[in-house]
């Protein structure tokens, strides 16, 4: 199937009598309720369930192996190849399936807040609530922009279309396929809305580096003096929570680009975890869940329609999607200068990493490439308790290119703009998972505040005798004993054994980076 034929098929779909293009938020909410796709909550948000797929399905994600990208993609377990023949046949079947639907919902918008680098996109949805989701998550065009909008990438989403693995070359009924040549994302068999968001992120992670822009899985905010901070970390490590600071303006909560001009948000909304959400803990997120927002897999009371954020009956990966303007202290457009401070967030299930450490450039490169954290319950199917993992660049599932490409760009930018880098453990303290407890959020906020305001630049540090990290001895608002993880363990010998075990895991994982400079290994990694 040629690119021309792909475009003809899209044109027919978009011009069919069933295509509802660029509906407003109230119209989409009405459609969701009329079609019985979701319920209205007491705050006016739409609550929808995603069925059995309550998280991403990494094993069902494919990139079409096309001549133009075959030698650029880092093929493997993350970037699984699928043939053009399989894609073309499945694409044709999905289009025929969607043509028969009474209604289709189309959103046109952008990815990338910096006008110099934004990607015009369109999303064709089988579900109205999915269209509401992308309306809130991506960048919405003005009426004037809409008149000249020409999509450069299209998502075609058909959750109720099930693939046949024996025929379609998939691993299950679900599929998320990206064709860079045809500029199509094809999604089916899963109702999890996050697949649409992350597909566009994966695409930007391919396109932006070609323009010498570092694409990053991070949140970002900016202080009153224009100082920019980045927060890296996988789902559930605290990116959204910790960057929602009442004293700083939010640039974005999850996906950014770093160009020669500075930092820009890739999205136009936020996709926040809301398990155990309360107004007391996270007022910005709690208050953002208003009319037009989307709640995913959140249980609501049948009579009062009040959301119960503590109920994890469906999944722990409950989510809220809302536009940037639902938060008070944001910066719009979502662009800012170069980062002054970079925070690497890790949820260390072994409980041995310090709650905060200062990193040299080499250590920053090492820990960026390592991307150590723990997979937390619910962010992927089948994960019900924390599992130690190394996710390269804190975003391995979304990186189509070789990891060294992103790491080299980060190292260059850290050096050029003199950014200060810190490793922050939001995981366990006083013992490993099951023995210790989760790090106190108030302490984490105090440590990050000290990093942002420059206090940690002048505080005394001690070198960790196993990881070689520089650990501050004093942080305002944090008990000194919390800063040195060994002090929080009752059994000091057990701590040392566990720390050495983790250090060895770091070393074993790093062996896969055979083209990395010796300086990064010798000066950046564990010393014991």
UniProtKB/Swiss-Prot annotation:
Binds 1 Mn(2+) ion per subunit. One of its GO terms (cellular component) is cytosol. It is found in: Cytoplasm. ATP binds at residues 198, 217, 233-241, 282, 319, 444. Pathway: Carbohydrate biosynthesis; gluconeogenesis. Its cofactor is Mn(2+). Transmembrane segments: none annotated. It is an enzyme of class 4 (lyase). Keywords: ATP-binding, Cytoplasm, Decarboxylase, Gluconeogenesis, Lyase, Manganese, Metal-binding, Nucleotide-binding. One of its GO terms (biological process) is gluconeogenesis. Its EC number is 4.1.1.49. One of its GO terms (molecular function) is ATP binding. Gene3D superfamilies: 3.90.228.20, Phosphoenolpyruvate Carboxykinase, domain 1, Phosphoenolpyruvate Carboxykinase, domain 2. InterPro entries: PEP_carboxykinase_ATP (IPR001272), PEP_carboxykinase_C (IPR013035), PEP_carboxykinase_N (IPR008210), PEPCK_ATP_CS (IPR015994). It catalyses: oxaloacetate + ATP = phosphoenolpyruvate + ADP + CO2. Involved in the gluconeogenesis. Catalyzes the conversion of oxaloacetate (OAA) to phosphoenolpyruvate (PEP) through direct phosphoryl transfer between the nucleoside triphosphate and OAA. PANTHER family: PHOSPHOENOLPYRUVATE CARBOXYKINASE (ATP), PHOSPHOENOLPYRUVATE CARBOXYKINASE ATP. Belongs to the phosphoenolpyruvate carboxykinase (ATP) family. This is Phosphoenolpyruvate carboxykinase (ATP). The lineage of its organism: Bacteria, Bacillati, Bacillota, Bacilli, Bacillales.
